Swiss-Prot record:
Catalytic activity, as annotated: ATP + H2O = ADP + phosphate + H(+)
Homology family: Belongs to the RuvB family.
Entry keyword annotation includes Zinc: no
Function field: Acts as a transcriptional coactivator in Wg signaling. Proposed core component of the chromatin remodeling Ino80 complex which is involved in transcriptional regulation, DNA replication and probably DNA repair.
Name of one Pfam family that matches: TIP49
EC primary class: hydrolase
Top-rank taxon: Eukaryota
Record organism: Aedes aegypti (Yellowfever mosquito)
SMART domains in UniProt: AAA
EC number: 3.6.4.12
Major location (coarse): nucleus
Protein name per the record: RuvB-like helicase 1
An annotated GO BP: DNA repair
Length: 456
């Protein structure tokens, strides 16, 4: 006898740098807690982000921009991701890095516009009318062929549908008769017909016929409940970029050339402004009719100092357009030269006229106790058992070097502790791995001391 254990099929995800961030960690009054939802400290920045989330939810923030500025390792990206978590899945959130705009295939401004359109959602509400039930009658009505001759054409189809609540007789278009034939619909089948599109779907055979045959490959379904005619509201969330792509890529024909074109990987094409304007017209028409509503999302541009002067000029125009998302920038630069210029120095590497339009949120470096809390949180997220003395040693390393370096030492220290036959990371493991790996400051010091031995 063979007995096998059923293994769990729970989806495991890689633990990333910000896996522990679950939200902004604010109370019901919008006041930040010292340690909540995976964030520690940065109370002012989190409170400001909470106000931004409220503005986004009330749709009063679109077309405005926010800048998260602070030294490296102070939680700028974590706050941006926490904003995304707070907004939920229904609001589009599009993260990108400043260097992504440089491509050999398409223009920088095109990449920016593409991400702008990805950050703007459209919620389409559609009322679908559906006829559902068991087929009690299926009669095609024939008429004389209008073209003459002896052939007959089908003018309409009379179909009877039955549910637990009642029956209805419908007169259908001849085009639906073809769909009924394709689905191989017979009397006794349970089907549904969409009134708007005329789509027919056979769900299976009614379970009242289950005893009809001994050998049967049919799937038997119960008689539908409720009325034959049902109205159902379907809500669909799409982004403007989805609409652009759907209309920019026409479907190929049946000839050999179109098949070859589909097999060969096409070069990335630019979506024209004309097409976008046409889509905007259709979207505005839908909004006026009340069919759709616009959902301004968030475009997060990390390392914004990597953009050049052309991109910043384009951002000006885009932020002032009628359909614009909320843009969040993040940078760790102080005063530096604006990319694309020779000698124009500006705060954060952003032109002054754009800086003037931004709300700036500052993130401050963490103190020793906050670093300790973050390291505890990361150890918990990675499922590691760490002694208090080891956490204290790591906190001191993080205070002297960087928080990222201290967090990165956790996994090598765990490996070292496993090799030594322990289950808990001790201070000795931390000291040992700190001696094996260098941080940026110590590495720079070695370079300075042994400058002559390296190639220039």
């Amino acid at each position: 006898m063979k007995i096998e254990e059923v293994k769990s099929t729970v989806k495991t995800q890689r633990i990333a740098a910000h896996s522990h961030v679950k939200g902004l960690g604010l109370d019901e009054n919008g006041v930040p807690l010292q340690m909540a939802a995976g964030l520690v400290g940065q109370k002012d920045a989190r409170e400001a982000a909470g106000i931004v989330v409220d503005l986004i939810k009330s749709k009063k923030m679109s077309g405005r921009a926010l800048l998260l500025a602070g030294p490296p390792g102070t939680g700028k990206t974590a706050i941006a991701l926490a904003i995304a978590q707070e907004l939920g899945n229904k609001v589009p959130f599009c993260p990108m890095v400043g260097s992504e705009v440089f491509s050999s295939e398409i223009k920088k401004t095109e990449v920016l516009m593409e991400n702008f359109r990805r950050s703007i959602g459209l919620r389409i509400r559609e009322t679908k009318e559906v006829y559902e039930g068991e087929v009690t009658e299926l009669t095609p009505v024939e008429t004389e062929n209008p073209m003459g001759g002896y052939g007959k054409t089908i003018s309409n189809v009379v179909i009877g549908l039955k549910t637990a609540k009642g029956t209805k007789q419908l007169k259908l278009d001849p085009s639906i008769y073809e769909s009924l034939q394709k689905e191989k619909v017979e009397v006794g089948d349970v089907i549904y017909i969409e009134a708007n599109s005329g789509a027919v779907k056979r769900q299976g055979r009614s379970d009242t016929f289950a005893t009809e045959f001994d050998l049967e490959t049919e799937e038997y379904v119960p008689l539908p409940k409720g009325d034959v005619h049902k109205k159902k509201e379907v809500v669909q969330d799409v982004t403007l970029h989805d609409l652009d792509v759907a209309n920019a890529r026409p479907q190929g024909g049946q000839d050999v050339l179109s098949m070859v074109g589909q097999i060969m990987k096409p070069k990335k094409t630019e979506i024209t402004d004309k097409l976008r304007m046409e889509i905007n017209k259709v979207v505005n028409k839908y909004i006026d009719q009340g069919i759709a509503e616009l959902v301004p999302g968030v475009l997060f541009i990390d390392e914004v100092h990597m953009l050049d002067l052309e991109c910043f000029t384009y951002l000006h125009k885009s932020l002032e357009s009628a359909i614009a998302p909320i843009v969040i920038f993040a940078t760790n630069r102080g005063r530096c030269v604006i990319r694309g210029t020779d000698d124009i120095i500006s705060p954060h590497g952003i032109p002054l006229d754009l800086l003037d339009r931004l709300l700036i949120v500052r993130t401050a470096p963490y103190n020793l106790s906050e670093i300790e809390q973050i390291i505890k949180l990361r150890a918990q997220t990675e499922g590691l058992s760490v002694e208090d003395s080891a956490i204290q040693a790591l906190s001191e390393i993080g205070d002297n070097t960087t928080l990222r370096y201290a967090v990165q030492l956790l996994t090598p220290a765990h490996q070292n502790c496993k090799v030594n036959g322990r289950t808990q990371i001790t201070k000795d493991d931390i000291v040992e791995v700190n001696g094996l790996f260098l941080d940026a400051k110590r590495s720079a010091k070695f370079l300075q001391e042994e400058n002559t031995k390296y190639m220039m």
